């Protein structure tokens, strides 16, 4: 069958439960083809295609019948569209002909039609009809204020009939639905039709004579559901035979949905899978776990690799730590090795990572990979829907799970969905390079709350979202004093804190991830680390240490930094023998071959610099191309005179905070030189900011740091440590969850209603 429905007041209207029921019914029955038949322009329909809760149409008839396109490709349905095109005289001819009437043009997109605001008195002027006929146009007047000039003989009904003939469907296989006189042409008795509840009186009056037109009681989608029953679609019992329901709730009050399990899995000597506490210095996992320390019932959803042909039993649920978190379980999503490679290692890093960090020209966008990404995100959503209690809070993490909110909202509309974007979010012109931007934004806007590190990233997201669908700003707030406004490239004066999508209000916030200060304190207190610091202090006597710690990645600006260091030594020969740069570069996984060329370029630069400037007893550059234990890195932090962090783009940069913590805990006076394109630059007042895209500025800023007076260095570090120590990772988690769980208070704060 074909369901041909008007949108506003019909397919988009009615009780939320009726809407969900109808949408799920359509999704469950692929034999139901869907056509949007609307007075909106095609451009105004596009935002709906980004809404994952709406069934996507097979066909779209827009502009009151003047535009006909395929729902998937948005390409014209030919030859139907060409037939309409031939009937249209052109916008300028219509505008010129009615210029003396001083009608106000509607400020909405219009194609092959001209739409005006017109009062009943103006509409009654017979000259308008005469002009329309002379142009070869029809006039359509609706709702006592809208006047449309349309191609002769073209309306919703005529275009729908042309589509049905083109599809070679019997009219008996069609159900039409509408609510205003604008829909009369497709509710004139040639098809089974429904005037949904609360329809325009004029439409009800005009259709009473038609036996095939049913007048429903319930509004919007509820009326369409009534029509399914009335006409016996989907069998004799109609919609009553449908058994699809919203997923039954689980028991978890708080859901963590993360790409990593809260423990590490490894193979023991016997080849069996074993588990242990995380050994990574990542402080986020312990913090997220801490929310379950009070006995709160929760579930942690993450993927685990599993070979279906291995013969091993897959444990979908495991305990995390029975003593510390007695009511927390890990809900594991089984992924094959191929799915892991595509979803996590290849697609996310080759398509999304470069685009998010503004290196879109490096992106590789494969539709097959996108389909795997959707499949995995759907699996995450289904697992979450099964675990979550009624009204539970779901906390999703990062771009790997972009599409989960959309799927989850459909499965469990009762849930409170929160998303934290750990990675940088670029400006709209960069993000829009992604072929799937509409689907991604549409999914994220199903959240109740979305958090980013800094205000600039919040605003970038809002700009990208505005390019997908119309948004109304609900509230904004000043970024100061928490964040720098005009003092860095990623600063901002005001940010949006809530937007209205038309279906929901989405709250937004800036929450820079904090540091686990106790982990740094513990590392520095270890006897072997104290011995290491003493050894380094002796080895570096008379030499200033510049430290650089980063992963091997083109976003980190490693080559740019090495070139700036070479310039520093060239222009300041008095530094030879007096300064050394130690770079710790963590290699990428073996499968990440996209970094091979960069690694070669870095190795050449290191060799060139040491070859040019090295002396007996002094090496200008020490390069560690390996991962060092966090405790050892902490010792280097404590000994550094200058910490040189110069990513070309970064969501935040926790290394900067680790350096500040190590120095602050030991009353040091190291200087932080930080890229102004790192998210942390908007938060860490006291850092020396540098532009990694400007070689001269890079060199000069490093030189200033090396020669900074002790008093200034100490003052800057005190300011930095105060920020890092106060806004630690525990505060980050508490504030984020508070914003999610009490959105009204968050909104009141944004509006300045509370202190």
Curated annotation (Swiss-Prot):
Gene Ontology MF terms in the entry: alpha,alpha-trehalose-phosphate synthase (UDP-forming) activity; glucosylglycerol-phosphate synthase activity; magnesium ion binding; phosphatase activity
CDD domains cross-referenced by the UniProt entry: GT20_TPS
Record keyword Glycosyltransferase present: yes
UniProt pathway annotation: Glycan metabolism; glucosylglycerol biosynthesis
Entry keywords, A to Z: Glycosyltransferase, Transferase
Alphabetized Pfam families for the sequence: Glyco_transf_20, S6PP
InterPro entries associated with the record: Gluc_glyc_Psyn (IPR012764), Glyco_trans_20 (IPR001830), HAD-like_sf (IPR036412), HAD-SF_hydro_IIB (IPR006379), HAD_sf (IPR023214), SPP-like_dom (IPR006380)
Coiled coil: none
Primary enzyme class: transferase
Domain of life: Bacteria
Entry EC no(s): 2.4.1.213
Entries under PANTHER family matching the protein: BCDNA.GH08860, TREHALOSE-6-PHOSPHATE SYNTHASE
Family: Belongs to the glycosyltransferase 20 family.
Protein function: Involved in salt tolerance by producing GG-phosphate from ADP-glucose and glycerol-3-phosphate (G3P), an intermediate in the synthesis of the osmolyte glucosylglycerol (GG).
Protein name: Glucosylglycerol-phosphate synthase
Source organism per UniProt: Pseudomonas anguilliseptica
Gene: ggpS
């Amino acid at each position: 069958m074909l369901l041909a429905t008007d949108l506003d007041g019909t397919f988009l209207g009615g009780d939320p439960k009726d809407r969900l029921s109808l949408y799920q019914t359509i999704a469950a029955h692929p034999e139901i083809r869907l056509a949007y038949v609307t007075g909106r322009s095609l451009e105004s329909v596009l935002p709906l295609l980004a809404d994952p809760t709406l069934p996507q149409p097979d066909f779209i008839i827009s502009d009151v019948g003047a535009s006909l396109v395929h729902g998937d490709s948005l390409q014209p349905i030919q030859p139907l569209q060409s037939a309409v095109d031939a009937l249209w005289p052109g916008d300028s001819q219509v505008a010129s002909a009615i210029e003396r009437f001083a009608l106000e043009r509607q400020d909405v997109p219009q194609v092959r039609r001209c739409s005006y605001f017109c009062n009943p008195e103006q509409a009654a002027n017979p000259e308008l009809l005469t002009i329309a006929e002379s142009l070869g146009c029809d006039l359509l007047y609706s709702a006592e204020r809208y006047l449309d000039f349309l191609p002769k003989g073209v309306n919703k009904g005529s275009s729908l009939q042309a589509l049905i003939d083109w599809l070679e469907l019997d009219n008996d296989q069609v159900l039409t639905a509408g609510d205003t006189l604008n829909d009369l042409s497709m509710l004139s008795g040639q098809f089974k039709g429904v005037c949904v509840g609360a329809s325009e009186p004029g439409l009800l009056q005009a259709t009473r004579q038609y036996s095939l037109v049913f007048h429903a009681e319930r509004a919007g989608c509820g009326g369409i559901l009534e029509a399914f029953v009335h006409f016996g679609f989907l069998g004799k019992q109609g919609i009553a035979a449908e058994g699809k329901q919203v997923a039954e709730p689980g028991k978890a009050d708080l859901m963590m949905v993360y790409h990593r399990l809260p423990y590490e899995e490894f193979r023991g000597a016997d080849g069996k899978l074993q588990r242990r506490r995380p050994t990574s210095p990542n402080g986020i996992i312990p913090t997220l776990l801490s929310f379950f320390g009070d006995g709160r019932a929760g579930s942690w959803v993450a993927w685990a690799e599993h070979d279906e042909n291995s013969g091993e039993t897959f444990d979908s649920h495991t305990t995390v730590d029975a003593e510390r978190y007695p009511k927390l379980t890990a809900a594991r999503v089984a992924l094959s090795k191929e799915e892991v490679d595509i979803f996590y290692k290849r697609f996310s890093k080759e398509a999304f990572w470069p685009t998010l960090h503004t290196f879109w020209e490096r992106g590789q966008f494969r539709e097959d990979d996108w389909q795997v990404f959707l499949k995995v995100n759907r699996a995450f959503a289904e697992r979450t829907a099964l675990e979550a209690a009624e009204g539970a809070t779901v906390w999703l993490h990062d771009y790997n799970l972009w599409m989960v909110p959309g799927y989850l909202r459909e499965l469990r509309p009762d849930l409170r969905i929160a998303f934290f974007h750990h990675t940088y979010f670029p400006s709209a012109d960069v993000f829009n390079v992604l072929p799937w931007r509409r689907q991604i934004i549409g999914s994220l806007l199903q959240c109740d709350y979305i958090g980013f590190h800094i205000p600039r990233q919040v605003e970038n997201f809002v700009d990208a979202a505005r390019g997908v669908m119309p948004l109304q700003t609900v509230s904004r707030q000043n970024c100061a004093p928490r964040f720098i406004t005009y003092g860095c490239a990623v600063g901002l004066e005001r940010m949006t804190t809530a937007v209205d999508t038309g279906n929901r209000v989405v709250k937004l916030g800036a929450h820079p991830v904090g540091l686990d200060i106790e982990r740094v304190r513990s590392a520095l207190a270890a006897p072997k680390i104290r011995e290491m610091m003493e050894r380094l202090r002796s080895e570096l006597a008379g030499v200033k240490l510049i430290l650089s710690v980063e992963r091997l990645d083109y976003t980190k600006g490693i080559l740019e930094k090495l070139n700036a260091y070479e310039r520093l030594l060239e222009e300041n020969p008095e530094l030879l023998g007096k300064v050394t740069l130690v770079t710790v570069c963590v290699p990428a996984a073996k499968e990440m071959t996209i970094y091979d060329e960069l690694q070669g370029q870095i190795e050449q630069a290191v060799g060139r610099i040491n070859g040019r400037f090295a002396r007996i007893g002094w090496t200008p550059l020490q390069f560690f191309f390996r991962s060092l234990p966090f405790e050892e890195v902490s010792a280097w932090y404590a000994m550094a005179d200058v910490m040189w962090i110069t990513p070309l783009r970064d969501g935040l940069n926790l290394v900067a905070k680790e350096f500040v913590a190590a120095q602050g805990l030991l009353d040091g006076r190291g200087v932080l030189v930080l890229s102004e394109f790192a998210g942390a630059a908007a938060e860490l007042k006291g850092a020396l900011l540098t532009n990694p895209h400007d070689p001269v500025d890079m060199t000069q800023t490093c030189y200033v740091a090396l020669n900074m007076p002790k008093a200034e260095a100490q003052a800057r570090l005190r300011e930095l440590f105060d920020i890092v120590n106060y806004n630690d990772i525990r505060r980050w988690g508490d504030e984020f969850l508070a914003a999610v769980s009490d959105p009204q208070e968050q909104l009141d704060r944004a509006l300045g209603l509370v202190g």
